[in-house]
Amino acid sequence: MPLSSPKQRETPVSVSKSSAQHDATPSPSSLTPLSAHTTPGEEVSTLKQGATRDEKEATDGGRVEGDCSWFQEQTCGLILECVADMDACFKAFDKDEDGFLNQSEFSALCRALFRNERGKPYPVETSMLNTIFTIFDTNKDHVIDKEEFRYCWQKWIKQVVRPVTALVIVDVQNDFISGSLALINCPAGHHGEEVIPPVNRILEENRFDVVVYSLDWHPENHVSFIDNVHMRSLHSSCKLMCEETQVYDTVIFDVNNDGTPMEQKLWPRHCVQNTWGAELHEDLKVAEDAILVYKGTDPDTDSYSVFWDNNKKFHTTLNEELQKRGVTDVFVCGVAYDVCVAATTKHAIEEGYRTILIDDGCRGVSEEDIAATREHTIANQGLVVHSSQVKNLATGRDRPPALAYKLALEL
């Protein structure tokens, strides 16, 4: 994957308005060295596209569509080899040769499927296996016939063993590293720059189908800035007066002056459009095949997630871009762990993606909220992993049950 480091040049990257969520025309000098061309009217800027599937397969051991000779597992003392196609796989697990997969046979397939990169099987709860079987037994006759298995193969097994991956790098910008909202000054005392080495390493060692960089991109009068608190009416239910507010306080605005309350956490002024603080950090590698998402551009609405604003009224086109590329798995890293990374991870799960949170590629504001982010991710069939685990997950060599279960539940 070609990479570059952000440097200045005279011709900026620009993205034009596409929705109320993205109503600015950003031109961050930090992104200018990319061999990029933006399309007017797009809120998400797509840079040079990444490797083709053929190129990816060439770097992945020569695996090609329909060839599952790599899928060799041992279960119950029997070496099971799928050497050609879907029919060969079905036949390998149809032990009684009756033309169906009963629950026991299908469970054996799942146990063969759910293995780590060393071939060691994961423990799988019987209830999970039963649920997955029920999902694919669409006519509820307690066996999976060949037509049902075709659906299972196309929509589930192929995705489990050959995921289509996106890496979403959230807000690795100067203001969060060493600027006005540097994480070192937040309660957890984290060093935001510590995310850069693992993120760069992930980019260098892996070939994702798409890489996404998000940027907080606020106008001067943004609702989240504490020095702007006087610019909007506080709701009658708000217990704080303007002059009493402090950084990290949560106030309730009556933004539209119609009595509708809107909660807002107050932050120092940060990531103002076209300023140094809004640029990606100079040491962060930038992939040529990247999508850039600018968020928080509406003066009256904050936007932590790379998918949605905080009120979930306006969405970016990120989900559309991922869907166009057939993405199944979203890997998330960046800052702040418990704020924008947390919101992005939550929404990725809600949008139906198999979601992997890269723990050492994140730094955050509050240790308590970081722990809550991890717990929420795991409780919703996501994974929290170390960056060293990413390659095997992204290539389908490591196939944890939680991710396969999440995919089945979305069908």
Predicted regions and their residues:
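Glycine-rich anion-binding loop/nest that anchors nucleotide
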Residues: 326-343, 357-362
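Alpha-helical scaffold elements lining the catalytic groove of polysaccharide deacetylases
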Residues: 300-329
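Short Gly/Thr/Asp-enriched flexible loops that form oxyanion-binding sites at enzyme active sites
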Residues: 341-351
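Active-site acidic carboxylates
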Residues: 2-7, 13, 37, 43-97, ...
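Short, contiguous clusters of charged residues that form electrostatic/catalytic patches at enzyme active sites
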Residues: 151, 197, 313-320, 343
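Intrinsic disorder/low-complexity segments enriched in small, polar and charged residues
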Residues: 18-23
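Short, surface-exposed loop/turn motifs that are enriched in glycine and acidic residues
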Residues: 269-274, 307-311, 334
